[in-house]
Regions:
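Acidic/His- and Gly-rich active-site-bordering loop/insert found
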Residues: 1-29, 50-55
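A common structural junction motif
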Residues: 4, 147-154, 191-192, 263-268, ...
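An extended, acidic, His-containing surface patch that forms the Zn2+-binding/catalytic region
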Residues: 172-237, 243, 247-256, 268-364
Length: 367
């Protein structure tokens, strides 16, 4: 698991790094992603040792510190230490995740925008849906079209400041949040109908998260639909820069995704840089997946099956690894959001599940 966290924004009911307990919940950034689950794993390992369990293999806990970026930590670790034969990452969902979509973090130059737009800014991390977008526009701009949009308007030093708000969430699940940039681009495009760059972003990138409006609704049976999410927006020398989080189906190649995107974009559109994490697909009939499902189903008295996600964990960096928890089916999604928390009851429950999972993994002879 990992100890690094995504940035915090305003609006928390408790200090985001205070670990305050309210109504049986520990509030703070990282409580679910991923410090809380790693604490559960630590106590699970300690309890297993104290029980007198005699493993056939070595149990190792790996703590990373760059998972939210490019996983440079685990890449370095792999050059220094022999990788485990099998592993879990407590950084996803229960019951067990055996499929993770490919991740393509893109840095885009979309093109020139009107001189009437002096600045536009949103977000700080590619993999977080921004909950605030601001823009500075020239005072001469006709703002009457803004009446149709949910935009705050303020005067600042002889210029007009526009603000749009949304709901932050994980970039792998953009449909669970509200991207503040969408309303901003639609509003600016309405005020500047002849601006091709703004029109492209508003009409193609801010209509849905599955590539339908953009022209590449990629999908497969194994992992589902592609998703794309605007994470960071800036204006440099009049050019609109966007950091885009793309999660693509496992049966597609990243090169195909890039070409499909460029084919359906305006001429000025460029992918300046891209950070790619290849998809993961571990056989559902593997001893690891079957063993973990057995542990989870016994604890929860159910018959759950492995699932696919758009999120990315250390699992794709290790030879035989899958994400196992910590989020339980039906629980409120709080990862990367304001007021992230972990229920103490759930923390105790996941610790018990991890204890049983460690025992199961350590007893496996055939991998």
């Amino acid at each position: 698991g990992h100890l690094d966290v995504v940035p915090v924004t305003e609006g928390w009911i408790a200090p985001p790094f205070g670990g305050e307990i309210i109504d049986g919940k520990i509030y703070g950034r990282g409580t679910m992603d991923d410090k809380g689950p790693m604490i559960a794993c630590l106590y699970a390992a300690k309890a297993l040792k104290m029980s007198g369990f005699r493993p056939r293999r070595t149990l190792r806990l790996i703590f990373g510190c760059d998972e939210e970026n490019n996983m440079a930590c685990i890449k370095y670790y792999k050059t220094k230490v022999k990788m485990p034969d099998l592993a879990i990452s407590p950084d996803g969902d229960f019951p067990v995740i055996n499929v993770e979509k490919g991740i393509y973090a893109m840095e885009l130059d979309v093109g020139k925008v009107s001189d009437a737009v002096l600045d536009i800014s949103a977000g700080s991390r590619t993999n977080v849906v921004p909950d605030l977008c601001t823009a500075l526009v020239d005072k001469s701009l006709d703002l009457k079209p803004l009446e149709k949009f949910n935009v705050e308007v303020k005067e600042a030093d002889g210029r007009i400041q526009l603000l749009t708000r949304g709901k932050s969430t994980h970039g792998a699940m953009p449909h669970t949040g509200v991207n503040a940039t969408w309303e901003m681009f639609r509003a600016l495009s309405a005020c500047l109908p002849d601006d091709k760059t703004l029109a492209f972003v508003a009409e193609k990138m801010c209509r849905d998260v599955n590539g339908k409006a953009w022209g590449f609704p990629l999908e497969d049976e194994v992992s589902g639909k592609i998703t794309h999410s605007i994470g960071v927006v800036s204006l440099k020398n009049g050019n609109l820069k966007i950091k885009l989080d793309v999660r693509y189906p496992v049966t597609y190649k990243d090169s195909f995704v890039a070409e499909a995107m460029k084919k359906n974009s305006i001429g000025s559109f460029k992918i300046e840089e891209g950070h790619i994490k290849q998809p993961l697909h571990v056989d559902a009939d593997s001893p690891l997946v079957k063993g973990l499902l057995e542990v989870y189903n016994k604890e929860m008295s159910c018959d759950a099956k492995p699932i696919a996600i758009g999120g990315g964990t250390y699992s794709r960096m290790l030879p035989m690894c899958v994400a196992f928890g910590p989020s339980f089916p039906g629980d409120t999604q709080v990862i990367h959001e304001i007021n992230e928390y972990v229920s103490i009851d759930r923390l105790m429950q996941m610790a018990h599940i991890y204890l049983e999972a460690f025992a199961k993994m350590l007893s496996l002879i055939h991998i």
